[in-house]
From Swiss-Prot:
The chain crosses the membrane at residues 4-25, 35-56, 71-92, 96-118, 123-150, 154-181, 190-222. CDD domains: 7tm_SRI_SRII. Belongs to the archaeal/bacterial/fungal opsin family. Keywords: Cell membrane, Chromophore, Membrane, Photoreceptor protein, Receptor, Retinal protein, Sensory transduction, Transmembrane, Transmembrane helix. This is Sensory rhodopsin-1. The modification N6-(retinylidene)lysine is found at K205. Involved in the control of phototaxis. Mediates both photoattractant (in the orange light) and photophobic (in the near UV light) responses. The signal is then transmitted to the sensory rhodopsin I transducer (HTR-I). GO terms for cellular component: plasma membrane. The keyword Cell membrane applies. Residues 1-3, 57-70, 119-122, 182-189 are extracellular. PROSITE patterns: BACTERIAL_OPSIN_1, BACTERIAL_OPSIN_RET.
Length: 239
């Protein structure tokens, strides 16, 4: 087993820690209306961990048009990263429409980026450009739309800012790794890119679910403060 496969298995083991944090969070929220809503956080470390086990054995790694794509990596990202950004919106108290919007933007960024991996020439860079547009729209949700609706509750503001900046900083790194790797300008090796992605994925997902556990007091109230737009709807209905 080579260094990359070993790193993949190491990443899978590290993600078990994330599963433990979600389990502890779920147990600590017994009786809270947020308990069931936060349960899908488990998908993040579980799906990513299983994907890494598959990647370690080259499952889903294929050649398309002469270009290698680690299929399970993109399937993992397509499943888990929309959940990551969606729960940032949930922590902000954003509307369901906004949460779905940021999740769709993230999913399209990943899907179009995968298309850029298996194409060449002008089409590759056109797809990279489209993926970058979805990337920028995702940042608009994180840094413009969501901050407008966070209730004036210090604990909730603190959790939102922590999640927002954690995801925001890491989401800047991923396209740079892609750009310098074999799929982009080819300045980094496939092995180097693979090892970097393992590091980024574990760093993105395990601390993320830990933050929810560490700041679980936010979700222990009978109900969280409504977002401004929700409050407006409720006030209008009452009138």
């Amino acid at each position: 087993m080579d260094a990359v496969a070993t790193a993949y298995l190491g990443g899978a083991v590290a993600l078990i820690v994330g599963v433990a944090f979600v389990w502890l969070l779920y147990r600590s929220l017994d009786g809270s209306p947020h308990q069931s809503a936060l349960a899908p956080l488990a998908i993040i470390p579980v799906f990513a961990g299983l994907s890494y086990v598959g990647m370690a054995y080259d499952i889903g790694t294929v050649i398309v048009n002469g270009n290698q794509i680690v299929g399970l990596r993109y399937i993992d990202w397509l499943v888990t990263t929309p959940i990551l950004v969606g729960y940032v919106g949930y922590a902000a108290g954003a509307s369901r429409r906004s949460i779905i919007g940021v999740m769709v933007a993230d999913a399209l960024m990943i899907a179009v980026g995968a298309g850029a991996v298996v194409t060449d020439g002008t089409l590759k860079w056109a797809l990279f450009g489209v993926s970058s547009i979805f990337h920028l729209s995702l940042f608009a949700y994180l840094y413009v739309i969501f901050p407008r609706v966070v209730p004036d509750v210090p604990e909730q503001i603190g959790l939102f800012n922590l999640l927002k900046n954690h995801i925001g900083l890491l989401w800047l790194a991923y396209p740079l790794v892609w750009l310098f790797g074999p799929a982009g300008i080819g300045e980094a090796t496939a092995a180097g890119v693979a090892l970097t992605y393992v590091f980024l994925d574990v760093l993105a997902k395990v601390p993320y679910v830990y933050f929810f556990y560490a700041r679980r007091r936010v979700f222990m109230h009978s109900e969280s403060p409504p977002a401004p737009e929700q409050a407006t709807v409720e006030a209008t209905a009452a009138d």
